[in-house]
Amino acid sequence: MKMPKNNVYTVSRLNGEVRQLLEGELGKIWLNAEISNFAAPGSGHWYLTLKDNFAQIRSAMFKGRNRSVTFKPVNGQQVLVKGSISVYEPRGDYQLIIESMLPAGDGLLAQQYEALKMKLAAEGLFAADTKRPMPTNIQKIGVITSATGAAIKDVLHVLARRDSSIEVVIYPTQVQGDSASKSICKAIQTANARQEVDVLLLTRGGGSLEDLWCFNNEDLAHEIYNSALPIVSAVGHEVDTTISDYVADVRAPTPSAGAELLSGDAENKSEKLATFIARLKQSWQHYQLKTEQRSRSLENRLHRQDPKRKLEQFQQSFDEIQIRLNAALNDKLHKSTLQQQSLSYRLNQQSPQHRLTLESKHLDYLTARLNEGIKGKLNDVEMSLKNSAHQLETVSPLATLSRGYSITQDESGKVLLSSKDTQAGDTITTRLLDGEVKSTVI
């Protein structure tokens, strides 16, 4: 076989070019999948497998990215991730490098929101030079909101406190649900047709992304953009930002803030400053959108040459080795522990201490039996002594004395058996049970 002169690849070169091809062709992608084999080693990086019912792909999310994730991923969880395809060159495996991760439910809405925001920004609906100026002397405000919600109460309270001369026209509308966007569009059309107010305040209270979803509608965005009347969007809380906020001429963070923005009082200069800041913020947001679009192109071009990617791959390889090494060490430690326990048991069975313990127990048993035998023998001896004492007591002279008899002795101690053994003047001693009586013979 003739060897080709050109295009002879090494494995490293092949994997490197495959990586560049995949990263360059696909760019950033969104993926809806289930998490499995999730691992978070000490390096702070995350390694996981993303799968559906028919396929799976290895994935990595490095700690510089996963710090922004607001939840702890678990196996079996459905998520929506954004990332780019790459190749882990040491193994030749292709994998997904994750940049952002959301729970699947919130993630789909967030993805739709980002897609619509990019589309409308490209169409120029957020451009600062298209914003209508706020009237300088507002006499009548049109409020587009629910007639029974908390937002209208907050707005009326603020206007009454700051400038009671301002008239309010309420254009009641739905602010939540599938038909809310059409209802809001109709209210804007009605206000523009009547031309009875100086400015419109589009508002409602806070809620979840799903609750505020009607304000992220494309038709509503165009209706706000095409309105002849200037519009202030005051939807949700400080942290909530909707498409209507981007398209409106001015954005206020809350319904109360929107009412304060449009009402004049002694602090008019401060309000103008707040308006300027709000518009400046919108201009900055528009600038950020444009910058983000330009940076994506540069990011994709620089991504393949980024030294950080090489470092991340080395870190991933190190983490995998560490995970396998820890598993092997734990297995070895477990086996060694079992072996040590077995040897300890066998050694205990053969040790002198063990035998000494057994013999000591046997000695204790024999001692107990000996003590019981001695105790029994002593009891027998005691009983025999008691019997002998009783027998001796029955023949004792003292026993006779106890029955009223006495013993008489002369001075020498001799027992007198007859009166003939005495003479007049002799001293005799009569012994009774409880003492002695001395007498003189007459």
Curated annotation (Swiss-Prot):
Keywords tagged on the record? Cytoplasm, Exonuclease, Hydrolase, Nuclease
The portions of this protein that span the membrane are none
Kindly indicate whether the keyword Nuclease belongs to this entry.
Answer: yes
Q: What is its EC number?
A: 3.1.11.6
GO terms for biological process? DNA catabolic process
Compartments, as annotated in UniProt:
Cytoplasm
Q: Which reaction does it catalyse?
A: Exonucleolytic cleavage in either 5'- to 3'- or 3'- to 5'-direction to yield nucleoside 5'-phosphates
Q: Which InterPro entries match?
A: Exonuc_VII_L, Exonuc_VII_lsu_C, OB-fold_nuc-bd_dom
* Gene Ontology cellular component terms for the protein in this record: cytoplasm; exodeoxyribonuclease VII complex
Role: Bidirectionally degrades single-stranded DNA into large acid-insoluble oligonucleotides, which are then degraded further into small acid-soluble oligonucleotides.
Q: Which NCBIfam families match?
A: xseA (TIGR00237)
Instruction: Fetch the HAMAP family from UniProt.
Output: Exonuc_7_L
**Protein family membership:** Belongs to the XseA family.
| Assembly description | Heterooligomer composed of large and small subunits.
Q: What is this protein called?
A: Exodeoxyribonuclease 7 large subunit
Gene name tied to this protein:
xseA
